[in-house]
Design a protein with these regions (language model features):
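Signature of N-terminal electron-transfer/Fe-S-associated modules in redox systems
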Residues: 2-165
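Single conserved hydrophobic/aromatic residue that forms the stacking wall/gate
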Residues: 163-166, 170-174
Length: 174
């Protein structure tokens, strides 16, 4: 009975917006990290690799900034806007995914969600980066399959920049 009481005392209620949907009155263990919590809610695109913040597979956007969900407690996300790979704008993500496929930047798929989240953040920053800057920005995402060259090519692909800028402009007009 003492274990049940301890378990109850270590839980709290939080609310957040995940992929533009309100999630209110969610019960969470105070020591559970955001990555596990998101997966429990059904957001399986957030992969958990090292669970130490090194591999980048668990990247999500918290209030539009990239965060390692294995290093953030779910309670720290209370009141925040969370975007997982499933919540990225589908038309924009199709362009990014097409660039990854075209440049052979996807292999086993384990790092893909983290890479796509980082790529999305890079491209949406409204700035064109050099290859070295791209390498630096994706350096926090481990990929054991591609050797990174193809990923840099995909991120740098002018098609992604051109189409995302056009899509953004159309959205701003409407």
């Amino acid at each position: 009975e003492g274990i049940k009481l301890m378990s109850y005392l270590n839980k709290t209620t939080i609310s957040m917006v995940i992929n533009n949907e309100n999630y209110d009155d969610l019960t969470v263990e105070t020591r559970q990290h955001l990555g596990d919590f998101l997966r429990e809610l059904g957001f399986k695109g957030t992969h958990l690799g090292c669970e130490q913040g090194a591999c980048g597979a668990c990247n999500v956007l918290v209030d539009d900034e990239s965060v390692r969900s294995c290093l953030m407690l779910a309670v720290q996300a209370n009141g925040k806007k969370i975007t997982t790979v499933e919540g990225l704008d589908s038309s924009e993500m199709e362009i990014v995914k097409d660039c990854f496929v075209k440049n052979n930047a996807m292999q086993c798929g384990f790092c893909s969600s983290g890479m796509l989240m980082t790529t999305y953040e890079i491209i949406k920053s409204k700035r064109k980066y050099s290859r070295e800057e791209i390498r630096e920005m994706i350096s926090g995402n481990y990929c054991r399959c591609t050797g990174y060259q193809a990923i840099v090519d995909a991120v740098e692909d002018p098609v992604s920049y051109t189409h995302l800028r056009a899509h953004e402009t159309e959205a701003d007009i409407v």
